[in-house]
Amino acid sequence: MFDKTQTIADFDPDVWQAIVDEGVRQEEHIELIASENYTSPLVMVAQGSKLTNKYAEGYPSKRYYGGCEYVDKVEELAIERAKALFGADYANVQPHSGSQANSAVYAALCAPGDTVLGMSLDHGGHLTHGAKVNFSGKMYNAVQYGLNPETGLVDYEEIAALAREHKPKMIVAGFSAYSQVLDWQKFRDIADEVGAYLMVDMAHVAGLVAAGVYPSPVQIADVTTTTTHKTLRGPRGGIILAKANPEIEKKLNSAVFPGGQGGPLMHVIAGKAISFKEAMSDEYKAYQQRVVDNAKTMAATFIKRGFKIVSGGTENHLMLVDLIGKDYSGKDADAALGAANITVNKNAVPNDPRSPFVTSGLRVGTPAITTRGFGETEVVDLTNWMCDVLESLEAGNSEAVIADVKAKVLDVCGKFPVYGSN
């Protein structure tokens, strides 16, 4: 029998200390990694619930185990809310991650060796869009498109030319590091011209789409995938959405279970259901608009300070700071900002001369700082502090500047707590 009085701190102080330390890090560091956010306490409670105990292979009312009447209700709520939130006719809420959602779509719509056209990783795509180190580039004949070298924008003429030349079975639209609005209809037109499926990976902008501040691909693409964290601000996981097509829906369900996964994580699906309900509120819609407003303010401040932003600015939640030609690398910048308690990630930029482990760019995003309550004033201050740190790497006075910025970061973090004390 379990000891109800025992705490993690009592039983496993090593793990507990790591949990406490991570909580302190989240409170005392400014989070600018574009794919990270702070989920709500309600979602975290659901993920720590007794639903974690229940195996539920299959789908609601079609399980391979008994005792699923209550987890069926949870999954049905998640499905219906996902469909309502995104205007979808179909939703599968079981994928454990965005990558697994993408893998299921590949398995459902393509055969090994089929040609897939996706965005190059070093131009802002994702591993699962055809990168050679990923299943999508190993199991399939991946052809890659990128950005126009002069404009820094997605080159639809190149995509159309590649599609006509290679006749892909599926075109993948979406990104992990692109700061502009994609024209989903142009992708649809290209796919229709060559007889390809269109899959959209909207993992990075799903929250913006849910709030209506970024165009929705759901009724344009054959299939749309997303993570449930990032801008959506739910638990870590994935979902698959689609417009009505019984044949595709059947293939997608089979590709998730039993094709790629066994039992779904019912405690996480409960968290997804709660986060979808949160995303239906007016407060959430206002939050997503502030995410975009803050990103635009940040990009404008970087540009004002003389830094280059890939694509010339941002129309979503993220941007790439181009450091090509600087004496320091993306890795150097990442480390220096981290020492000042500002968390970013080094990122390759188009035509990057440095290796992917070093890079000549930074990817930054505003979802987490907006959740925290930052507005225009805080974003301008923060961006200027970042510029001060980056400039100090060339000026040779980085130690003093980093110490000064860290003190400012700790002060503003104290004024804008995430969850408060642990």
From Swiss-Prot:
Disulfide bond found in the keyword field: no
Q: Which GO terms describe its molecular function?
A: glycine hydroxymethyltransferase activity; pyridoxal phosphate binding
Which annotated residues bind (6S)-5,6,7,8-tetrahydrofolate? 121, 125-127, 355-357
Give the UniProt keywords, A-Z: Amino-acid biosynthesis, Cytoplasm, One-carbon metabolism, Pyridoxal phosphate, Transferase
Please write the reaction equations for the catalytic activity of this protein: (6R)-5,10-methylene-5,6,7,8-tetrahydrofolate + glycine + H2O = (6S)-5,6,7,8-tetrahydrofolate + L-serine
Where is this protein localized, as stated in its record? Answer: Cytoplasm
Q: Which GO terms describe its biological process?
A: glycine biosynthetic process from serine; tetrahydrofolate interconversion
* Pathways involved: One-carbon metabolism; tetrahydrofolate interconversion; Amino-acid biosynthesis; glycine biosynthesis; glycine from L-serine: step 1/1
Entry keyword Cytoplasm = yes
One GO cellular component assignment for this chain's record is: cytosol
PROSITE patterns per record: SHMT (PS00096)
Name any cofactors this protein relies on. Answer: pyridoxal 5'-phosphate
N6-(pyridoxal phosphate)lysine: modified positions? 230
Q: Where is the site described as Plays an important role in substrate specificity found in this chain? A: 229
Q: What is its EC number?
A: 2.1.2.1
Summary of subunit composition and partner proteins: Homodimer.
What does this chain do? Catalyzes the reversible interconversion of serine and glycine with tetrahydrofolate (THF) serving as the one-carbon carrier. This reaction serves as the major source of one-carbon groups required for the biosynthesis of purines, thymidylate, methionine, and other important biomolecules. Also exhibits THF-independent aldolase activity toward beta-hydroxyamino acids, producing glycine and aldehydes, via a retro-aldol mechanism.
Family statement? Belongs to the SHMT family.
NCBIfam families from the xrefs?
PRK00011.1 (NF000586)
Q: What is this protein called?
A: Serine hydroxymethyltransferase
- The gene it comes from is glyA
